Amino acid sequence: MSLMKEMLSAGVHFGHKKAFWNPQMKEYIFGINHGVHIINLEKTVPLFQDAVNFVGKTVANGGKILFVGTKRQAQDIVEAEAKRCGMPFVSHRWLGGMLTNYKTVRQSIKRLAQLEKMREDGTLESLTKKEMLQNIRTIEKLEKVLGGIKEMGGLPDAIVVIDSNKEHIAIQEAQKLGIKVVAIVDTNSNPEGIDYIIPGNDDAVKSISFYMKKFADAVIDAQGLDRAVEAKADEAVQA
């Protein structure tokens, strides 16, 4: 199946109601159907291919991609696909400063690791019941917000965002730090300042699944390429 047909099947072409449009998206809109803007997939296809290629190249060069999707219908998909390809993710709430104040976030990640170790080795059980419950609650709270980035080990090389409106703080932080931004931009969004714009439906579960699967596959393929290069290097050393 061609990429265009896959997008049509996933409903990528459905934008928002005309009343909610952002005029800056005009060049990516094909027309209106029953009061809803229809996105021009002839524009989306090459832009999406560019974005997927960029993600693959970044990973092949040893880079990390942070996937961000905190809206209800994106949460489970973002988490599952990010885990499948071994990349960090934020799927519940974007903490202000998650990138721009990463030093502080790193301290919270360290705290989470310490508490998890205490739970695993039984140290938590030696505390009073009140202290143990407080620490368990802290673990749950930190895990929910930071669980997806606890293995990130530093700032990402790029972020992939499902909804550029919803995740505007994440985008602003990435831009401040010169981190590349890939984003799904619907007809009600502002495409300005986004490095890799993907005009498309950012609400439908089928569309979100389509994007995330393609990105995760690109990461996995790039990791395979990376491993192949490493294997050749090892063979050369052994020879």
From Swiss-Prot:
Q: What keywords sit in the KW lines? A: Ribonucleoprotein, Ribosomal protein
Q: What is a biological process (GO) this protein takes part in?
A: translation
GO CC term (a single one): cytosolic small ribosomal subunit
Return the Pfam families for the record: Ribosomal_S2 (PF00318)
The family database entries (Gene3D superfamilies) matched by this protein are listed as:
Glucose-6-phosphate isomerase like protein, domain 1, Helix hairpin bin
Q: Which InterPro entries match?
A: Ribosomal_uS2, Ribosomal_uS2_bac/mit/plastid, Ribosomal_uS2_CS, Ribosomal_uS2_flav_dom_sf
User: Which GO terms of the molecular function aspect are on file?
Assistant: structural constituent of ribosome
Instruction: Write down the superkingdom of origin.
Output: Bacteria
Record family assignment: Belongs to the universal ribosomal protein uS2 family.
Cite the NCBIfam families for this sequence. Answer: rpsB_bact
Q: What is this protein called?
A: Small ribosomal subunit protein uS2
Gene that specifies this protein: rpsB
